[in-house]
Amino acid sequence: MPPREDPNGDASSASPSDPVPPPPQQPQPQPQPAKGKGKKKDEKKDDDLSEEDQALKEQLELYVVRAQDPDPGVQKLALESMRQEIRSATSSMTSVPKPLKFLRPHYGTLKAYFETMPESDLKKYMADILSVLALTMSAEGERESLNYRMIGSEGDIGSWGHEYVRYLPAPDDMSALKIAFEIYMKFGDFANALRIALLLYDKSLELKPIFTATDDFQLKKQFAFIIARHGLSIEIDDDIAADENEKEALQDIISNIKLSEGYLTLARDIEVMEPKSPEDIYKVHLIDGRGATSSSLDSARQNLAATFVNAFVNAGFGQDKLMTTPSDSSSSGSSGNWLFKNKEHGKASAAASLGMILLWDSDSGLAQLDKYLHSNDIHVVAGALLGIGIVSCGVKSDCDPAFALISECFSRDESIIRIGAILGLGIAYAGSQKEEVRENLTAFLTDSQVPLEILVFSAISLGLVFVGSCNEEVAQTIICVLMERSEPELAEPIMRLLPVALGLLYLGKQESVEATAEVSKTFDEKIRNYCDVTLMSLAYAGTGNVLKVQKLLGICSEHLEKGETHQGPAVLGISLIAMAEELGAEMAVRSLERLLQYGEQNIRRAVPLALGLLCISNPKVNVMDTMSRLSHDADAEVSMAAIISLGLIGAGTNNARIAGMLRNLSSYYYKEAGHLFCVRIAQGLVHLGKGLLTLSPYHSDRFLLSPIALAGLVTVLHACLDMKSIILGKYHYMLYILTLAMQPRMLLTVDEDLKPLSVPVRVGQAVDVVGQAGRPKTITGFQTHSTPVLLAAGERAELATEKYLPLTPVLEGFVILRKNPEYHED
């Protein structure tokens, strides 16, 4: 064995999906005449190399020739020199080390020679070199790198560089997390163990052992709050809590019964209970010029926009100035008047908006929506059914009133009422995997007489209810629909949501989607590629898988025939996969900006939505500027997508800069009904819940991703890929699916009886302290406030008093505080 080299030699940091090498011993092309372009190109290529690089290249080529020398002594020297060059090559993380670059053309030659070598130490040395070269050369799926590693010499593989070591094993992250889980359990840090269990949920880790490992009832209540925030619905059985009162208390917390109460406590503390009207949001008096005198253009559409703005702004407050007024005791009150200022399907959205205003308060909500269920107007009934779903979103109840009320209306013949009922069920039971819902909705999918729109909404609702479950029966039903429909039907804009419904079943489940993806290759060519890309991007959502991002970027770089639409979902897929961590997200933003410059039109239309998803409820200045530029784009679809995305990145932040941009856009587009509608929706989103809500699917210090919240966002974004036909058409009520992602961005500290407890906390920018020894500062640039407080994107809170101890390490949402027995007041 030759002496070991510097163990930090970074031997390779190339992507494994680089082009496949040329076949072994490919004949060199003959030089062309001097006049030909080829010669000049070759000369130019060599001119680009510095003298040092040129010398290295020639040296390596000499080693390749000598490595095939019949004399073992010469061979050994050449191989050792080559090993040394590769191992001592240092490079940045993003580029291929030079020795690998220069050896690339000779990979085939060395591979072919390796097969002819007799068994010896020299053959092992050659295998080591080929193993490292295979990182950048071998075809995907061949696993040549591992193959040559096994044949090669035993020993310290770390000396070839950490990228090489990282690339060799299959993903070990799951086993590492399981070990972390076991360590947390062993040392009694159950709250952190629960966070890991939620991350690996459905992948073999159960939640019950965490509850049974402790007898501390207060701690169990804190676990219940964490699970409720994640959106999981689990049953509390006798093993978790033997006492009936304790069992009921835990079930109430997991069912989110306390959410509305906590949210309103925050609102009262911040003094934002006063209802706001759409006019308060538009702030027309601040606009100078033409948009100030509100145009009477398409007043029904303006009323519809006002309905959405009103619903978004007053979400969860239980009162507003349009739908819930004191004279509301009779249906002839002003809420009735506003309802009938909308036309046809606009009335459905208006009635459903009441559900959003009363969000999470199911008792009061169901009582107020009940009167609309008995209306003679089918659109009002449909809206009421959707409203029942919205008000019950994330809130479970023993008697299941939402299912009882909604399922009564399935027998109605009117298409709009059925859609209201179907979407209502999807929103109310998202993530619950409730069997009764499956039976009801599958009946629509298997009925060949049902209109297309009912098929699509049934599939979407099934996708939401069974999100991430990999449920074979539901998948099979949706696949049958996709196979049986004719080409003209598949060309309908709304049909693009069927592959999304199928993808939701595999959200974040990675390889589990492969069997279904194979089946999708047999679909009609109209929808085949769209389905394939959508399935892949949803299955790898939130994983940060670089290879899949590369594949999607490859799809975006193709030049398509007219009529192909699958590049839109590919662009969304890039942000879906890359949103997992900060660095990946920043790199994706850069890639998306390149696509804006060089991409085809259908790619440019999706880029604003992808950026909106990457920075949701997190208004970054560079993304904001890009959106501002695109909102004036010559292509109407691009500018509308950019306007909606301005709303998404500012969702629930009350960001003054975005609010100003949107006001200017409302005057710029005052004659364009479609654009103005988008501006209004964006204004409503920016002031979501008067600035108390977020749409971000990440929580618990960006460690956990709520699949239900992500499912809601993905569905709406795919609908926005065809803004004119879906959101600006008659399916505007799809915007209510965003309810699934709405969560208060609060820190509410409570005592052991769950009564609000005001304590001082420091709130500042989170600092990444992973791997640092001791107790480093976890936040920077903090301010001290008294709870309850709001947490913006990227902020973290810590207690500023030692009087209490929190029962969870991550201060977000509901946090139970316990008195510190060792604390003595001076």
Give a label for each model feature.
Residues 17-25:
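N-terminal intrinsically disordered, low-complexity tails
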Residues 102-106, 110-113:
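Residue-level recognition of alpha-helix termini/interfacial anchor residues
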